[in-house]
Swiss-Prot record:
SUPFAM superfamilies in alphabetical order: Histone-fold
Protein name from the UniProt record: DNA polymerase epsilon subunit C
InterPro entries recorded: CBFA_NFYB_domain, Histone-fold, Transcr_DNA_Rep_Reg
Domain of life of the native organism: Eukaryota
Annotated Gene3D superfamilies: Histone, subunit A
Organism of origin: Debaryomyces hansenii (strain ATCC 36239 / CBS 767 / BCRC 21394 / JCM 1990 / NBRC 0083 / IGC 2968)
Purpose: As accessory component of the DNA polymerase epsilon (DNA polymerase II) participates in chromosomal DNA replication.
Record's subunit section: Heterotetramer. Consists of four subunits: POL2, DPB2, DPB3 and DPB4.
């Protein structure tokens, strides 16, 4: 057996190497456990077969309903504000545009933006149509627009040609007569020229007084009386005045009754009497 080396026999270099090796090797000793008691959280143990309570508190349901109602109210207010802003920007009322939409039998529904776009497009079209007509009026050195300005604008502009049936181009009747495009009698020609000079827009024509009436067929054995139509017409225009009776016309004296009775007997004597057996 080898005897252990004595401590004195170790060199200084060997002692230094042993110290270095002891510093390089990690310590495997476990940490010291403190003697103080640390608090442990209490955990409730649940049984695996225990029924779970999934019921929701009624207060939470009411809160959700109130929140949804508030959101709906906010959306309605925003839509109303948008409608008011759109109506302020348009001169045409949106309600009238919706009524025009509903006149179409194939109409079902339209969004608010579609109604607004239709109103805006209508205003822009009317503005363009008026500007084109105003240019033609200024060419004639006039400040007021006339029908011929709109009709000439439709005839001259390709973009407005679709209105040719709605706004047709017209010509004064006097020019047509002078150019012999329209033939009229001399009497009618004078009347038309007078109308052109006075610039009458509308002429009211009275219906004839003696209108033809359909006569219904009479029954067998009946006959129509031959009254003149002129008398009936004059009577309808100028009826005879009605004479009012007075009390003195109704009340008669005794002398008047005697005279009238004598006259009646004389008239009967003069007449021929036919006797029937």
């Amino acid at each position: 057996m080898s005897s252990p080396m004595p401590q004195s026999s170790l060199n200084n270099s060997q002692v230094a190497n042993m110290i270095d090796e002891s510093n390089e090797t990690p310590s495997t000793t476990p940490p010291m456990i403190s003697n103080t008691n640390t608090p442990v959280p209490e955990i409730e143990m649940e049984e695996p077969n225990a029924p779970q309570d999934n019921t929701v508190a009624p207060n939470s349901i009411d809160g959700e309903k109130v929140q949804e109602e508030n959101e709906d109210d906010d959306e309605q207010e925003e839509e109303e504000e948008e409608e008011e802003e759109e109506e302020e920007s348009l001169s045409l009322p949106l309600s009238k545009i919706k009524k025009i939409f509903k006149m179409d039998p194939d109409y079902l529904a339209a969004s608010q933006s579609a109604v607004y776009a239709t109103g805006l497009a209508t205003e822009l079209f009317i503005q363009y149509f008026t500007e084109q007509s105003l240019v033609l009026a200024k060419m004639d050195k006039r400040k007021k627009l006339q029908y011929k300005d709109f009709s000439n604008a439709v005839a001259s502009q390709d973009s407005l040609n679709f209105l040719s049936d709605t706004v047709p181009k017209t010509q004064p009747i006097g020019e047509l007569i002078n150019s012999k495009k329209v033939n009229v009698n001399s009497h009618d020609n004078n009347e038309i020229r007078e109308i052109d000079n006075t610039e009458i827009d509308e002429i009211e024509v009275d219906e004839p007084v003696n209108a033809t009436r359909k006569v219904k067929p009479l029954a067998k054995g009946q006959q129509t009386l031959n009254f003149s139509a002129t008398n009936t017409a004059t009577e309808s225009i100028n009826p005879m005045p009605i004479k009012k009776s007075v009390i003195s016309d109704i009340v008669t004296t005794d002398n008047e009754t005697e005279v009238t009775s004598k006259e009646a007997t004389e008239e009967v004597e003069d007449q021929d009497v036919i006797m029937i057996n």
